[in-house]
Amino acid sequence: MNLIIGVAGRLLVGKNYCLNTQRLKHVLPDLPYDYGALEPILSAEIMQVHHGKHHAAYVNALNQAEEKVKEALAKGDTQAAVAGTKLMNFNTGGHINHTLFWEGLTAVKNSGEPNSELMTAIKKDFGSLETMIDKLNAKTIAIQGSGWGWLAYDKEMKRLQLACCPNQDLLEPTTGLIPLFCIDVWEHAYYLQYKNLRPDFVKAIWKIANWKIISDRYIKARG
């Protein structure tokens, strides 16, 4: 099954999907910067492990799961197909979430600030940029176990929202919200550098937030 990964990470997995016999494999995306570009916030070592090992593992597992589902469907093995689909969902989430995460980061010197339209929306919906950051930090730090904190756009309510998703659940399919920026709080995202100090990592990540990308996502989501 070939996935079309957009800024919202749209994905339909379940009853209604098809598998091509000439399926293209998913590949680990190149980072838009070097492993050391996010220092001192994220070390080159943690970036190499996180991207080159953990994200790569999700990509490989997704390819394997898709192949297993294809084989199970060909054999008429419903039980194996269902089990394989669960693995596809999990690893698709890991692949898309990480892709959005990497794209939303940049070197400290390039972080910038929200464009005027996004800043206006932030002030309207949260009062100030600092208040929004504090609220998302608190929600993200409080995640039990592993998961993701999100700044998102609610197209129905026409406003910004904050959300958290456990494990590798995808934001838009589970909440209807369109992702703008995400914070990974799986331990592999920070433990090598920040040890058990998740709050320090979450607060520091904003120093490398790519506000140009986040602003562009907002404009696109708003339509």
Curated annotation (Swiss-Prot):
GO molecular function: manganese ion binding; superoxide dismutase activity
Cofactor comment: Binds 1 Mn(2+) ion per subunit.
Residues that bind Mn(2+): H50, H98, D184, H188
Family affiliation: Belongs to the iron/manganese superoxide dismutase family.
Transit peptide: 1-24
Cofactor annotation: Mn(2+)
Subcellular location: Mitochondrion matrix
Function, in words: Destroys superoxide anion radicals which are normally produced within the cells and which are toxic to biological systems.
Protein's organism: Onchocerca volvulus
Record's keyword terms, sorted: Manganese, Metal-binding, Mitochondrion, Oxidoreductase, Transit peptide
Record-listed E.C. numbers: 1.15.1.1
Catalytic activity: 2 superoxide + 2 H(+) = H2O2 + O2
EC top class named in words: oxidoreductase
SUPFAM superfamilies for the chain: Fe,Mn superoxide dismutase (SOD), C-terminal domain, Fe,Mn superoxide dismutase (SOD), N-terminal domain
Protein name: Superoxide dismutase [Mn], mitochondrial
PROSITE patterns named in the record: SOD_MN
Cellular component annotations (GO), alphabetically ordered: mitochondrial matrix
InterPro entries, per database record: Fe/Mn_Superoxide_Dismutase, Mn/Fe_SOD, Mn/Fe_SOD_BS, Mn/Fe_SOD_C, Mn/Fe_SOD_N, Mn/Fe_SOD_N_sf, SOD_C_sf
Assembly notes: Homotetramer.
Annotated transmembrane regions: none
